[in-house]
Amino acid sequence: MITSVLRYVLALYFCMGIAHGAYFSQFSMRAPDHDPCHDHTGRPVRCVPEFINAAFGKPVIASDTCGTNRPDKYCTVKEGPDGIIREQCDTCDARNHFQSHPASLLTDLNSIGNMTCWVSTPSLSPQNVSLTLSLGKKFELTYVSMHFCSRLPDSMALYKSADFGKTWTPFQFYSSECRRIFGRDPDVSITKSNEQEAVCTASHIMGPGGNRVAFPFLENRPSAQNFENSPVLQDWVTATDIKVVFSRLSPDQAELYGLSNDVNSYGNETDDEVKQRYFYSMGELAVGGRCKCNGHASRCIFDKMGRYTCDCKHNTAGTECEMCKPFHYDRPWGRATANSANSCVACNCNQHAKRCRFDAELFRLSGNRSGGVCLNCRHNTAGRNCHLCKPGFVRDTSLPMTHRKACKSCGCHPVGSLGKSCNQSSGQCVCKPGVTGTTCNRCAKGYQQSRSTVTPCIKIPTKADFIGSSHSEEQDQCSKCRIVPKRLNQKKFCKRDHAVQMVVVSREMVDGWAKYKIVVESVFKRGTENMQRGETSLWISPQGVICKCPKLRVGRRYLLLGKNDSDHERDGLMVNPQTVLVEWEDDIMDKVLRFSKKDKLGQCPEITSHRY
């Protein structure tokens, strides 16, 4: 099917002549009457630029041209009306417009009756003469057609580049001796495993094409019927430049002229006379194809910088519409197909961000629905879609999420709250002990305001809190408080099960016991109870309260060394005779870290049964 269609296109092209290519080139920039990239309902659909002769008017560079250094004489043989083959000679002079044969004539406007020809310098060994055509951007090509003004070359090769001539890939080889000239077996079968392999053939000499050689890019390629889903063939037909390299004009002179078998008929001629018949001459180099836009544009235009580029639709961008335009990264870019235009979709940032990125993992987890992640959310918003309020702000439900003031400040009291954050649903700030209110702006029932910024609200004392505190006989039972030692050493650290740095937040009396609310800030030794950072309680017995052993102050930091005590029924830590409490100072950190390191390495001093 593909082969017959290509042959039909080639036949139609040949019948109309080069003017057909000029026609499409002339109107390829004109905007269509309707947008082919959307159907009548506005739904995006695949669209492609018009089929044109991509070579028309494009520059061609020849490695060799006759008459460049000096006038050259070249001769051809033609069959006259009487059937007699006669030799006709002309002069090529690049300085004379009427006698010059530059490579630019290959892509100009030709007609069947007025064929202008490029001619190479006549030579006894005309090898490795090349023609390089630059298309200016990527095209998806259907065929390359070459119309020769003289006898067809015996051996030549077609190459393509997809990176503006930096690298070259062979397209097709032509030769009557493929193995000798190109080191390739002739007419190799193409399978799906070698669809990008260049084939060597002698069909140009043996076929009925006369002086024209045409190479259809997809002919005999197995995946041509499924081109949309074949990245291999899509790459195969993509090119920015085409190069033709002539390797051999003819195996021998007699074959060149199609004369009698008497190869010595020109034996008396000089080398200069013989070489006048050895040259390459081509009148037309045509390349049929479409501007490559990956199904996202119906035409190509010149941009403000003068570059030939696709007029991209479907929220795509790039010279070939090969990427999504900025802020349209909610889905991955894809080539448009007959079933899906694969339009790029804008990120959903609720109008709070101007930039976003694509996250493939999020896209997969969403069931291939959304993968956009908003960047630099503004207006105090946060989240991948700027759909949340950042810490310190809460949603104003009276306004839509797209409003620039959709997130308002929590307004947490700087003294009564533990931070600036609040509950995203209720707006409730996190209050310090004894503080209440949505913004933590007042003392709770049973508490009174203090002058401390650490504990702004303290519990109002009751008579029960002071029972027994004035009994002198109990005070007489108090001895020296060993819980607060004069100095801290390695042995004390090693004998205790846990070691933490804590800050005292509040104090209250419960049945004669002093209950301190503390926050463990650092853990140097966890013990079997697996001490963790965070809020907990520290209990001091009634006797310790009376004796003020230890004497703790709200807002101060301490180093607490203790033994595991799971017998008591109170939650938190218990101060007992084995507890060591040292008020935290700046120079204590290094000492504690040193003790902790030795303890972990088993370098503790020998421990006796003495209590300390």
UniProtKB/Swiss-Prot annotation:
Keywords, alphabetical: Basement membrane, Disulfide bond, Extracellular matrix, Glycoprotein, Laminin EGF-like domain, Neurogenesis, Repeat, Secreted, Signal
Subcellular location(s) of the protein: Secreted, Extracellular space, Extracellular matrix, Basement membrane
Positions glycosylated per UniProt: N114, N128, N268, N368, N423, N564
GO cellular component: axon; basement membrane; cytoplasm; extracellular region
Annotated ranges, domain Laminin N-terminal: 43-290
Keyword Repeat: yes
Record has Secreted as a keyword: yes
Listed InterPro entries: EGF-like_dom, Laminin/Netrin_ECM, Laminin_N, LE_dom, LMN_ATRN_NET-like_EGF, Netrin_domain, Netrin_module_non-TIMP, TIMP-like_OB-fold
Gene3D superfamilies, alphabetized: 2.40.50.120, Galactose-binding domain-like, Laminin
Domain NTR intervals: 478-604
Span of the signal peptide: 1-21
Disulphide linkage map: C117-C149, C291-C300, C293-C310, C312-C321, C324-C344, C347-C356, C349-C374, C377-C386, C389-C407, C410-C422, C412-C429, C431-C440, C443-C457, C478-C547, C494-C604
GO molecular-function terms, A-Z: signaling receptor binding
Disruption phenotype: Defective gonad distal tip cell (DTC) migration whereby DTCs migrate towards the midbody of the hermaphrodite on the ventral side rather than the dorsal side of the body resulting in ventrally located gonad arms. Double knockout with mig-38 RNAi results in failed gonad DTC migration to the midbody of the hermaphrodite.
Laminin EGF-like domain location: 291-346, 347-409, 410-459
Alphabetical list of CDD domains matching this protein: EGF_Lam, NTR_netrin-1_like
Cited Pfam families: EGF_laminin, EGF_LMN_ATRN, Laminin_N, NTR
Subunit note: Binds to unc-5 and unc-40 receptors.
PANTHER family the UniProt entry points to: NETRIN-A-RELATED, NETRIN/LAMININ-RELATED
Function noted in UniProt: Component of an extracellular matrix cue that guides dorsoventral migrations on the epidermis. Required for the guidance of pioneer axons and migrating cells along the body wall. In particular, it is required for the guidance of axons from neurons, including SubL neurons and AIY interneurons, into the nerve ring. During gonad morphogenesis, involved in distal tip cell (DTC) migration from the dorsal side of the hermaphrodite body to the midbody to allow for formation of gonad arms. Its association with either unc-40 or unc-5 receptors will lead to axon attraction or repulsion, respectively.
Comment, domains: Mutations that delete the second laminin EGF-like repeat impair only dorsal migrations of mesodermal cells and axons.
Protein name as it appears in the record: Netrin unc-6
Source organism (scientific name): Caenorhabditis elegans
